[in-house]
């Protein structure tokens, strides 16, 4: 199965009639493995900041999480495994696997819990596969 199939079929899937706004699977080095049509163009330093927060949980909290220049307020995640951000009526969930970062971006009416479920389920599957 291609990485694009994971994005199209497993991240951009229907959840109680709702869908993520955008999603992507990105290597730890910032290389895009696959992305949905609406995934924003991020900056390399934003991925560096995200990777630093996984290594040193809480490092993004004072400054916020930036993705494509948009600031998200960092909310409770799972240290070293999941970063969650909130911006207005939407937000982002980022799950770290051994080799990749799984991004899910949502807007209402999708809920943070629905986004978390989709992103973390995919991330857990990839971890189980050794990825």
From Swiss-Prot:
Family to which the UniProt record says this protein belongs: Belongs to the profilin family.
Species name: Lilium longiflorum (Trumpet lily)
MF GO annotations: actin monomer binding
InterPro entries assigned: PFN (IPR048278), PFN_euk (IPR005455), PFN_sf (IPR036140), Profilin_CS (IPR027310)
Xref: SUPFAM superfamilies: Profilin (actin-binding protein) (SSF55770)
Keywords: Actin-binding, Cytoplasm, Cytoskeleton
Protein name in the entry: Profilin-1
Subcellular localization(s) per the UniProt record: Cytoplasm, Cytoskeleton
Subunit structure: Occurs in many kinds of cells as a complex with monomeric actin in a 1:1 ratio.
Keyword Transferase appears in the UniProt entry: no
